[in-house]
């Protein structure tokens, strides 16, 4: 936990007045709450909490988990749904119920299910609640069904074009947004040829942002993919 908090503190110091959303999720509520409180004390502006993984809580358990943290920590909270990694989907009814909490400000959608994402966007229209893409290849489709932005991997490598694509889509200029989506498509695919964050760390090293070191059990990107990234 100490190292986790040091990373949050280092980012806040490095970016000065840019808002920082700290990832503070865990597979148990007590640990997620502690990380969230410490991130708040460090000066984070908001929290991103992946749903509890591996232990597969019921939907009522997910509601209790997120509400407990939202009640205790006075920061906006983004719920993060990525069932391919956690083993449990946050269902639309659950997301809608969570959206009614004043401190739960958004939902990062990485389920790959556009029908579900669109339903959540539709049913939270009257809430102050952002539905954000968590999958670069689905950012444009997500906005088309009511999403309001993205938390992007590709933006670490192509921030300008990613922002331009999102901005064009939100402005209703889908011709320009599609053009940028197709330009970025090869990068979207390359960044997921192996488990995230392996490819993006390699790409950032290529761009000069430091070594692509990994902690076990993650490994460096396979040689066969490095050339394509370059």
Feature locations, PLM:
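Active-site beta->alpha loop and helix N-cap motifs at the rims of alpha/beta catalytic domains
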Residues: 1-87
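A general structural signal for well-ordered alpha-helical segments in protein cores
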Residues: 4, 8, 32, 66, ...
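Conserved, mostly hydrophobic/aromatic
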Residues: 11, 39, 69, 107, ...
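C-terminal alpha-helical cap/extension of soluble enzyme domains
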Residues: 21, 147, 154-230
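Generic secondary-structure boundary/loop-capping signal
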Residues: 51, 79, 87, 111, ...
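Catalytic alpha/beta core domains of metabolic enzymes, predominantly
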Residues: 72, 83-183, 188
């Amino acid at each position: 936990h100490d190292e986790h908090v040091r990373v949050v503190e280092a980012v806040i110091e490095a970016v000065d007045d840019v808002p920082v959303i700290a990832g503070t999720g865990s597979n148990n509520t007590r640990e997620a709450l502690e990380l969230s409180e410490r991130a708040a004390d460090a000066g984070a502006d908001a929290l991103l909490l992946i749903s509890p993984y591996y232990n597969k809580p019921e939907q009522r358990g997910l509601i209790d988990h997120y509400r407990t943290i939202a009640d205790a920590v006075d920061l906006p909270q983004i719920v993060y749904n990525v069932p391919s990694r956690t083993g449990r989907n946050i269902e639309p009814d659950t997301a809608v119920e969570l959206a009614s909490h004043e401190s739960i400000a958004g939902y990062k959608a990485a389920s790959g299910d556009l029908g579900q994402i669109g339903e959540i966007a539709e049913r939270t229209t009257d809430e102050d609640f952002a539905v954000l893409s968590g999958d670069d290849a689905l950012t444009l489709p997500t906005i088309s069904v009511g999403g309001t932005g993205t938390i992007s991997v590709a933006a670490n490598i192509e921030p300008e074009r990613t922002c331009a694509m999102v901005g064009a889509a939100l402005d209703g200029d889908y011709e320009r947004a599609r053009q940028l989506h197709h330009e970025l498509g090869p990068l979207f695919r390359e960044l997921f040829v192996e488990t995230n964050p392996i490819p993006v760390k390699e790409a950032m090293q290529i761009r000069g942002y430091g070594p692509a070191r990994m902690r076990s059990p993650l490994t460096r990107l396979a040689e066969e993919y490095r050339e394509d990234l370059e």
